[in-house]
A protein has these predicted regions:
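Short, surface-exposed loop and linker segments with low hydrophobicity and enrichment for Pro/Ser/Thr
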Residues: 16-19, 29, 92-96
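Contiguous beta-strand segments within globular domains
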Residues: 19-26, 30-37, 193-198, 217
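Bacterial Sec-dependent N-terminal signal peptides
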Residues: 1-22
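Non-catalytic cap/lid and distal C-terminal segments of serine-dependent acyl enzymes
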Residues: 43-84, 89-245
Length: 245
């Protein structure tokens, strides 16, 4: 009986300590960090893991951890106990094998709202709330690793890359871009807030200053510019490409 208890003790302890953990550092950051730390694992290198988290069956793995006022000089340890994943819920349940690992911090900002509440949210930076493209987010370069759930492993990951700002679209003869600060939104969110628009102008707009035109408004989903417009006709010899539907 004593031997059975010893065996169970050793078995349970080996299961507890045989964990895969990730030690994440922030070498280029200063001060405190807020945001969602995302651990990304992919079985292939067709693209960076941050671009392979999808809604379909072929999605790769992601595990999240919210950090709040985290000292940037202190590494963050990601384990099965403090992360939540998709489509695999627990980090400990990752099958053994080779993976490409990448970690990204989707940064949050503090808003002191007019209603008296203080919230931390990911401010849109022109990318349309796409965490894997948001300027200012920091991430690591993909690295190939081998995971063995039966052994204790710690992988060190350095978030030394930064997503650059999005280049503003340029005005043309027919397409203009405006950005207006909203008084109501600025007052509510406690910081300058803007509304933007891409404007398609009619022929002769610059010459006919006294002419009034009808206005058609289309609310897209964060388009980077006005699409579907060109000043040259398409090639007459292009073959027809019919949709199967």
């Amino acid at each position: 009986m004593k031997n059975i208890f010893i065996f169970l003790f050793l078995f349970i302890n080996s299961a507890i300590f045989a964990q895969t953990t990730f030690q994440v550092s922030f070498p280029n950051e200063k001060g405190l960090l807020d945001g969602r730390l995302l651990l990304l694992l992919s079985k292939n290198n067709k693209a960076e893991p941050r671009f392979q988290v999808l809604d379909g069956h072929d999605t790769q793995l992601v595990f999240g951890l919210t950090i709040d006022n985290w000292p940037s000089a202190k590494p963050q340890i990601m384990t099965t106990g403090n992360t939540f994943g998709y489509p695999i819920e627990a980090l400990k349940n990752i099958p053994a094998g080779d993976y490409y690992v990448q970690v990204l911090l989707h940064k949050y900002e503090t808003f002191n709202r007019k209603d008296g509440k203080t919230v931390k949210l990911p401010m849109d930076r022109g990318e349309g709330q796409q965490w894997n493209l948001a300027p200012g987010n920091i991430y690591s370069k993909p690295v190939k690793i081998s995971i063995n759930p039966k052994s204790a492993q710690t992988f060190k990951v350095s978030l030394d890359q930064t997503i650059p700002p999005i280049e503003e679209p340029k005005d043309t003869k027919y397409i203009k871009h405006i950005k207006i600060q909203s008084k109501l939104l600025t007052e509510f969110w406690g910081r300058p807030m803007y509304l933007g628009a891409h404007i398609l102008l009619p022929e002769g707009f610059e010459e006919k200053k006294d002419v009034k035109y009808p206005l058609a408004i289309f609310h897209g989903h964060f388009p980077g510019d006005f699409d579907g417009f060109r000043t040259t006709p398409p090639d007459e010899n292009l073959p027809n490409d019919y949709n199967s539907r």
